[in-house]
Amino acid sequence: MNNELFALKNLPDRSQKPRNTGLTMVMDKGLSLRETSDFLDNSSDFVDIVKLGFGTSFVTKNLEEKLRLYREANIPVYFGGTLFEAYIVRDQFNDYRRLLEKTKITHVEVSDGSLELPHLEKCQYIQELSKDYHVLSEVGSKDAEKIIPPYEWIEQMERELEAGAWKVIGEARESGTVGIFRNSGEVRSGLVAEIIRKIPIEKVIWEAPQKSQQVWFLSLYGSNVNLGNIAPHEVLPLETLRLGLRGDSFDFFL
């Protein structure tokens, strides 16, 4: 940040990298190498982790070079949970492990948003992978018609953290219209409140791709709430929201 130049007082106490709270997780849905380089040059100070969305890594040209760029910027990368599910449904878990080793990935997502997976089996994958990786486990369905009651969200998050997950992710997709949100994009505020009563907030990354959703979380839970599925071009705007330097959050931290 440039605050030595600006000398602006009374900014919120923003956590510093490497962060455990106030994480910004970016969703890379197919940036080119040049776009990745430009993105990191402009925004790397405010990015904590990058997800290569769904199965985009499979069709990404120069994938290993892209991963190298992120490594050189000290930003962990993980493959989208849909890719994990694609391996599981084909009974190729060992092949997935080999992929992680070959690509020197340090973080991994375990999800069941597209796949019917018994929760005990999901927790077993988390337990196994957590021996070697930081596991992010995603809770919630990608199906807008499937409503999961709050107690079930909480039970799943608790069990997945107990199994070894580093963070649990509140599902919203890249659209922000399922899971913790209604199809209009409105936050299911009662669900979020129930979750936070039982799950430490620093253990949850809330997928919040829309600005209104980011503002809602920041207004209630402060500048250091973990937010995910942020578009690369929205990283700097989100950081201004976290600091109260945008109209939507101007008076949050005064």
Where do the language-model regions lie?
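Active-site-adjacent beta->alpha loops and helix N-cap segments on the catalytic face
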Residues: R34, S57-Y70, A86-D95, G113-Y133, ...
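C-terminal alpha-helical cap/extension of soluble enzyme domains
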Residues: E4-P12, E194-L254
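Hydrophobic faces of well-ordered beta-strands that scaffold small-molecule active sites
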Residues: T21-M27, D48-L52, V77-G81, V108-V110, ...
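Active-site mouth loops of central-metabolism enzymes
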Residues: N20-R34, G53-T56, Y78-Q92, E138-E152
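Catalytic cores of alpha/beta
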Residues: Q92-R98, I148-E162, P209-S223
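Generic structural signal for hydrophobic
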Residues: F39-S43, Y70, L99-T103, E128-L129, ...
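Glycine-rich phosphate-binding active-site loops on the catalytic face of alpha/beta enzymes
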Residues: E109-S114, E162-T177, N224-L241, L245-D248
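Conserved N-terminal beta1-alpha1 strand-loop-helix module at the mouth
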Residues: M1-L69
